């Protein structure tokens, strides 16, 4: 297995729509294993953060694959479940605003509004079709990762909301960005060429 790397903004591949996976073969299984390894490698370098999930486009692989950590509260639980060709079939419930971060958007966090409930259908890596009913943090994480498959980043949902952006300090505390115009709105490293 050749280890890939996590790509970050403004890499244009993060803005492209991913292709459906036609067949779950060794190449796809290798991509999934790379995603798991990279997620844990990233986490090991970020002591205050937990790698909850990842999408294949974050490695520059434009395939509709995501992985979600089985327990997003426990760093010791390093198991991720892969979902292939995930599709949102329904969102419901009130919209809830909460913090999100992203391996591909370094050092920036945001308060993003998302539906509280979501239904998703997908295939597991062994080819079984699954239907997921998720609420809260799992719903948020599924929506965030499926956005990646459509070339959408969490920052796109809050681009014009000055008070929605945060940075993490050296102690792991999230603090509002000080200069929205410079750090967010006019930051070419976030948005790239438009």
Question: Which sequence ranges carry the predicted segments?
Answer:
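Positively charged
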Residues: 1-194
């Amino acid at each position: 297995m050749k280890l890939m790397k996590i790509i970050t903004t403004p890499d244009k591949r993060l803005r492209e729509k991913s292709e459906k996976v036609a067949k779950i073969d060794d190449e796809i299984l290798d991509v999934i294993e790379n995603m798991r390894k990279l997620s844990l490698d990233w986490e090991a370098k970020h002591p205050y953060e937990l790698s909850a999930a990842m999408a294949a486009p974050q490695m520059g692989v434009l395939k509709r694959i995501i992985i979600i950590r089985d327990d997003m509260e426990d760093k010791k639980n390093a198991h991720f479940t892969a979902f292939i060709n995930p599709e949102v079939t329904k969102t419901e419930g009130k919209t809830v605003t909460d913090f999100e971060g992203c391996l591909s958007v370094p050092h920036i966090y945001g308060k993003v509004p998302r539906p509280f409930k979501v239904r998703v259908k997908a295939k597991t890596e062994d080819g079984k079709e699954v239907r997921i009913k998720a609420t809260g943090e799992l719903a948020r994480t599924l929506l965030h990762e499926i956005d990646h498959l459509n070339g959408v980043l969490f920052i796109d949902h809050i681009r014009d909301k000055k008070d929605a952006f945060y940075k993490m300090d050296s102690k792991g505390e999230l603090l509002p960005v000080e200069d929205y115009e410079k750090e967010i709105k006019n930051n070419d490293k976030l948005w790239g060429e438009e």
